[in-house]
């Protein structure tokens, strides 16, 4: 076992390295996200998570707690994304959310309405929670994920924003592949 005089400095260094997320910088999380967005691109994720969402150990996932509700945080994130020309979000929602009963989770109905209003006009996809988590885990092995944790205490309300290219789409890619003589 190494002497404590070697372990303690290493532990302090490791803990301080984990706090380097620019999202926690002065100016608040919104200023930090505004600073990060130009560096992000397609395949990056921004997750707006409920309060029970676990702190993940993957080095590609940066977590910050901002408080507030899912809907108000989502609106702020989407407003910042709308200012970007290089990316556009694809919102992934848990399919389970639509089946959660008000009796089991008081407030879920209003939360659904608030999230739907925040996502009006957005590209929204649904999938089973574990399928979205697998997609996020795979992505975080190669690409950064920003996880914004709220104070929401309702199940299956996390919104997973998968960033896509803002100036290119599937149709254009298909035409390019056809011009190159590639088939699927």
Question: Which sequence ranges carry the predicted segments?
Answer:
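Ordered, amphipathic secondary-structure segments that act as subunit-interaction surfaces
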Residues: 86-110
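C-terminal catalytic "cap/lid" subdomain
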Residues: 32, 67, 86-87, 146-149
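Feature captures the catalytic cores and cofactor-binding loops of soluble hydro-lyases/lyases
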Residues: 54-55, 63-89, 109-126
């Amino acid at each position: 076992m190494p002497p404590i005089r070697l372990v303690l400095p290493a532990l302090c260094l490791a803990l301080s390295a984990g706090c380097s997320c620019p999202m926690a910088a002065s100016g608040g999380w919104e200023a930090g996200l505004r600073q990060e967005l130009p560096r992000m691109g397609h395949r990056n994720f921004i997750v707006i998570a409920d309060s029970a969402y676990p702190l993940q150990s993957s080095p590609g996932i940066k977590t910050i707690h901002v408080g507030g509700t899912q809907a108000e945080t989502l609106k702020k994130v989407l407003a910042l994304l709308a200012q970007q020309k290089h990316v556009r979000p694809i919102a992934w929602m848990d399919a389970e959310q639509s089946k959660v009963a008000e009796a089991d989770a008081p407030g879920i109905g209003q939360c659904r309405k608030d999230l739907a209003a925040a996502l009006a006009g957005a590209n929204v996809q649904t999938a089973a929670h574990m399928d979205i988590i697998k997609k996020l885990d795979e992505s975080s092995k190669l690409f950064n994920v920003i996880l914004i944790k709220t104070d929401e205490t309702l199940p299956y309300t996390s919104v997973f924003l998968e960033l896509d290219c803002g100036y290119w789409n599937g149709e254009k890619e298909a035409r390019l592949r056809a011009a190159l003589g590639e088939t699927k």
